[in-house]
Amino acid sequence: MNQQRYAAYRSLVTELNEWKFARALQPETHEELCDAAEGLLLARGGDEAEEPLARASTTVLGMLALDELDEQNASWLLDAMLSCGPRMPQALEHAA
């Protein structure tokens, strides 16, 4: 973890809390995304970050499928998640 990743994590959690309080995010989904963000924050390398990133991606894709999230916010959310974790060049290649 470093200061930049911690700041990204705090910013993401603040935004997720706002979405939850605005009822734009279900409590279970909020918990899943916050847990994944914390897992990414605490990951020391790409291998440790794969599982929380996969959970976050699955959650975001599910929200897109149910029209609970638009593509712009989904893209922002995944970018914000990636910012919480260690550099993962292979994740960026697959996301493009």
Where do the PLM segments sit?
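Intrinsically disordered, low-complexity linker/tail regions enriched in Pro/Ser/Thr
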Residues: 1-21, 96
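Amphipathic alpha-helical binding modules
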Residues: 9, 57-96
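Amphipathic alpha-helical interaction modules
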Residues: 16-62
